[in-house]
């Protein structure tokens, strides 16, 4: 009866009353999976005027605790696994725990490919490209056994990101736990500057080249239509081939993002103080969710240094 009242209160928009009743339900029946899942969702803030509201660290942590209980009682609740993965990685920055979380989903649903997508993304973010490649191979084999155009397209995009980032890493790698890594000097040199946006890069680099080539084409080709088609083709072609240059220019941002992810994953600090108070750091951290920033602030205050021998605990395939 209390559970029905809780659902009714939620439908009427009284989230606070609904949450209180759901909590009462689990206090009486700890095995009520639906009530635990409701607590996980109702703990999160409600969207306001079409704008997605982000949870703070306490809300995210409370929701995550309820999600853990949900999947323990109902391992087949795919929606709960997805929400848990998003909170753990996107809102709390616990990427290493995220790998373990998706291992749990594999145990519950061995044929589900979502865990592999998520784990590859985490490994790429943390710079573990060899392991990411191994997971991708398994993912490709799984998709071959259950053909799907959407999954194939998604896997293709993920592989493109992997190959692009892995290629960049082969040119210049970065291990945040190593305070003597040369890439820290690169980040430090660029700490007073913001990254170059793709729009700015296209306007200041790609468009002038296209304009010059287009002007030359107009002098040679009499047809306006042909010239327009050539300009469009040149624009997309140059934009595609110049993307690698943009990635190189923005390496400091990419490396700093990795260092921040390592800090949040390990619970220990590795970013030098001169970089932490820089314009680049402020730009990067503002893109993270409020709960991520809040948790990172707690880690910063603890001041416990990241050991040089730290390494990610990657689940075996």
Segments and roles (model prediction):
Residues 1-31, 38, 44-55:
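Alpha-helical segment of the N-proximal tetratricopeptide repeat
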Residues 24-25, 69-70, 104-105, 138-142:
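Canonical positions in the second alpha-helix
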Residues 192-262:
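Transmembrane alpha-helical hairpins and terminal membrane-anchor modules
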Residues 12-20, 47-66, 92-104, 128-135:
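Structural signature of tandem alpha-helical TPR/SEL1-like repeats
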Residues 35, 80, 115, 148-150:
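TPR alpha-solenoid repeat register
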Residues 58-65, 107, 121-147, 160, ...:
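TPR/TPR-like (Sel1-like) alpha-helical repeat modules
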Residues 30, 75, 110, 144-147:
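Short coil turns that delineate tetratricopeptide repeat
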